[in-house]
Amino acid sequence: ILRCLVGSEMCIRDSIRKLANYGSAVFLGRCADYILKDIKNCTSVYLYADREFRKNRVKEIYGSNAEIMDKEEKNRADYYNYYTGNRWGDINNYDFAINTSKVSFEEAADLIYRFAKDKQKNLKDR
């Protein structure tokens, strides 16, 4: 994994697959939902929020404004769309989606944990 060139998309893909096959892991972004889509015991989650909530959160945490947020979101969308052929933000690409402007981050974490645990149990019961 460490022998890869920084920024190499093939390295990122291979690293995500190796780590996922090694054991439990959490990946944020980098098209991990797409890369791991054929792994049965993988749970992909999409976290989203309404624009006003995101704008306030970005300002609170990073001191950034909506213009910077919009640019960063466009970059993420372009990256995801280019490497997957799917549309970034389409909740149909995921097992589970949570609107984090409607629940606390702690509640979201609990929902994810319970969903993943139930999914694993259902896979074992088959």
Q: What are these language model-derived features?
A:
Residues 1-7, 11-12:
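Single conserved hydrophobic/aromatic residue that forms the stacking wall/gate
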Residues 119-126:
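C-terminal helical "lid" subdomain and adjoining coupling/linker elements of P-loop NTPases
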Residues 29-33:
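Short, polar loop motifs at secondary-structure junctions
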Residues 13, 105-113:
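Short, amphipathic alpha-helical "lid/cap" segments that border enzyme active or binding sites
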